[in-house]
Amino acid sequence: MTVASQVKQTLASLKGARGTLSMYTVQTRDDETQSVYTNSLEIADNIINDLEDRLKVLEFEEPQYKGN
């Protein structure tokens, strides 16, 4: 498995986890818990953005990985 495909797989997993966190954020009624979920969503978004940037670099360096 190439680095690019591992990054793509990690991104997909993280986006799924982010979706779950988002669902939990909407469903919870406790303010403190909602704050924790919101903070976790922000962290997940930052990581997703970092990985997407890294993937762009990988695809630029190795064009054969683009779109796979």
Language-model-derived ranges and their functions:
Residues 1-25:
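N-terminal acidic leader/helix
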Residues 8, 31-42:
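Short, charged, amphipathic alpha-helical segments
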Residues 13-17, 40, 47:
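Hydrophobic/aromatic residues within well-ordered alpha-helical segments
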Residues 21, 29-32, 44, 48:
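Generic helix-packing signal
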Residues 21-29, 55, 62:
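Secondary-structure edge/capping motif, primarily at the C-terminal ends of alpha-helices
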Residues 32-35, 60-68:
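Long amphipathic alpha-helical coiled-coil segments
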Residues 44-58:
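Amphipathic alpha-helical coiled-coil segments
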